[in-house]
Amino acid sequence: MASAATAGLTLLSGGASIAADIASIVTEQQRLALQKEQIRNNYELGKQSLSLQQQAMENSRDRIRLSAAQIKELGLDPKSELNMLMGLTAGAQPPISTPISSEQLFLNSSNLARSVRWDARNFGEAINTFAGLRAKHQANPNRPDMMLGSDNPNWGARATGDALSVSGLSVRSNHFGSGPSSLGSLSSVRSNPFSSISSGSVGGISLRTVGSRPSIRSVFSTTSV
């Protein structure tokens, strides 16, 4: 009797051990299945991330190619212009000691602005934010040649007024605003190839003279189109 009871207990103990082993194997299989699924999900997420990064790079290349083509249409050097724009976007100062060309005057700006270019052919290109920008003469970077923004009480609380909606300025003819100007006048607002804003309209601009050259003193009323 005792032997039979002992054999029965041994059998039960062995059965319980086998059941525990089976449960452990099932649990491990489930863990491995979950781990495999997690690895697969991470792999898919990595593929999607790489695909998005590649698409972003392609989009950047397309924007640079488009900007270069538009810069070239203006008769400027795409490589120099793009380098300057990239530097300004990052808040850097443009290289005043190495101007884009021998006849151009261009911007030494704060990091609030993209760029302002000024050349000897009396053509001005203003890009995006107007906030106390000072253009420098290439022969004498310490002398302000043109100032945009300045102090205008009509602007109200914002230092830049509504000038963010101005995307590009074309300077023509020989008279505007406060008096005669050998530089030209603001006769139109045109699309700016370097800005996400396509066009705008300027409601009021006044000119004043800095040294021997006039400057745009204020842009105090603008409307997006």
Curated annotation (Swiss-Prot):
Predominant localisation class: virion
Keyword Lyase part of the UniProt annotation: no
Quaternary data: Homooligomer. The portal-like structure consists in 12 copies of VP2. Interacts with capsid protein VP1.
Entry keyword set: Capsid decoration protein, Capsid protein, Host cytoplasm, Virion
Domain notes: The N-terminus domain points away from the virion surface.
Gene Ontology CC: host cell cytoplasm; viral capsid, decoration
Subcellular location, record wording: Virion; Host cytoplasm
Domain of life: Viruses
Record lineage: Viruses, Riboviria, Orthornavirae, Pisuviricota, Pisoniviricetes
UniProt-recorded name of the protein: Minor capsid protein VP2
Function: Minor structural protein that forms a portal-like structure at a unique three-fold axis of symmetry, following binding to the host receptor. The channel formed by VP2 may allow the delivery of the viral genome through the host endosomal membrane.
The organism of origin for this protein: Bovine enteric calicivirus Newbury agent-1 (isolate Bovine/UK/Newbury1/1976)
The UniProt record lists the keyword Mitochondrion: no
Any further remark recorded for this protein: Translated by a ribosomal termination-reinitiation process from the bicistronic mRNA coding for VP1 and VP2.
